[in-house]
Amino acid sequence: LLIDMDQSGVETKPIKLISGNSPFCETFFTDAIVPKKNLVHKLNKGWDVAKNLLQHERKMLASMGLGGSKAASKGKTGSGLATLSKKYVEVKEDKIVDEGLRQKIAKCDMNAHAFSLTLKRASEEAKNSNHGPSAATSIFKLYGSEHNKQKYEIMLEAMGTQGLGWEGGEFGPEELAITREWLRTKANSIEGGTSEVQLNVISKRVLDLPQ
């Protein structure tokens, strides 16, 4: 059912997350009445609608580590990891001295670029076939979740103790924002279906493996 959030009997209360943001809320229905015309699809076919919504959500979530779906579709996948890291680690001739960190940044950026091209290709194929997102979105969502978490892990590694702040004058606004966003990335492998659920979907609906 499509429900008017401003109608009588519907109340929402924000849920503040550890990141400090409130993208989620509790919704309370008290004697709320919704007209039958607001029914989406057919009666008792809500799961069909929900599954399609989940596929769209997973496609959107897949690109979050690339700066969002618009940035990914345009190939703008620069992570800014090198620029950020140079503020905190030893640099010689404009190159990060720590070879291990350099390799992590290079791998993350290359993976991001390859992933963005894959998302773009899949999006174009979906448009040309006149079909919506397929079960393959579970692959994108699974990888996108892990990629985003890895990216912020590298940021905190480069920042050292400056990446451990929660509040206080010794930490800058950008540092505090990155730390909170790092905490937020832990939810990436939960929202839109957990990584374990995605692996099940991939095995059954993409790879057609026996149960």
Task: Describe each PLM feature range.
Residues 1-86, 204, 209-211:
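FAD-binding core of flavoproteins
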